[in-house]
């Protein structure tokens, strides 16, 4: 088993991040502004994760100044999340931070090692299962077929109403994605039900991820 990684967590309801994507953030809460600055300084990864439930709700009817100077809702994070390193794009005059997280890998929480002012967890990488070598060629073929089916389905469902999306899917960069890359990077362009995306994130094979996507599109 690989060495545990210490990662700072940024729980965001309904946001599921996938490896190979970039997550833009507009950060205004004091604790998370501190987290961004600390992690950039210390070269610590930040995990962006969907949430299970609200632990403490935010105060209602806050002014912008109140929101900027007090912590908001606190959430219980999902156990599986994705993480990467942060780039600060801009810090505004009032202290807000525009940042991007370059998502690199999936992780599973082992234990919490800090809760205040922001959560830091010890985590283990979540890897795909290793297929039987004798089945590898047939699995890869099925995955390519599923990728083609999903692309065709998306063109029928969305393409006619969204020429920009149609051009993206038909473009050389999109067409060059292998099934594994496709099973993640699809969600840099499209957002589905967050719990479904969480199930895809937790799936431990490309085929399992593609099957969930295909079944969802065929409902």
PLM regions: where:
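N-terminal low-complexity, acidic/polar interaction/targeting segments
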Residues: 1-219
């Amino acid at each position: 088993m690989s060495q545990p990684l210490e990662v700072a967590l940024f729980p965001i309801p309904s946001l599921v991040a996938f490896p190979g994507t970039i997550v833009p953030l507009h950060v205004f809460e004091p604790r998370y502004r501190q987290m961004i600055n600390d992690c950039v300084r210390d070269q610590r990864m930040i995990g962006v994760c969907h949430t299970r439930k609200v632990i403490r709700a935010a105060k209602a009817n806050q002014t912008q100044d109140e929101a900027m100077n007090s912590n908001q809702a606190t959430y219980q994070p999902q156990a599986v999340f994705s993480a990467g390193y942060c780039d600060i794009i801009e810090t505004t005059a009032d202290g807000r931070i525009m940042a991007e997280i370059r998502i690199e890998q999936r992780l599973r929480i082992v234990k919490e090692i800090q809760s205040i002012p922001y959560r830091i967890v010890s985590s283990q990488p979540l890897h795909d299962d290793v297929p039987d070598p004798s089945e590898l060629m047939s699995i890869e073929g099925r995955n390519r077929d599923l990728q083609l089916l999903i692309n065709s389905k998306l063109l029928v469902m969305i393409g006619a109403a969204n020429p920009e999306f149609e051009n993206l899917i038909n473009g050389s960069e999109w067409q060059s994605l292998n099934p594994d890359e496709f099973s993640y990077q699809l969600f840099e362009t499209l957002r589905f039900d967050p719990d479904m995306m969480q199930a895809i994130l937790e799936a431990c094979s490309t085929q399992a991820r593609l099957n969930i996507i295909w079944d969802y599109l065929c409902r």
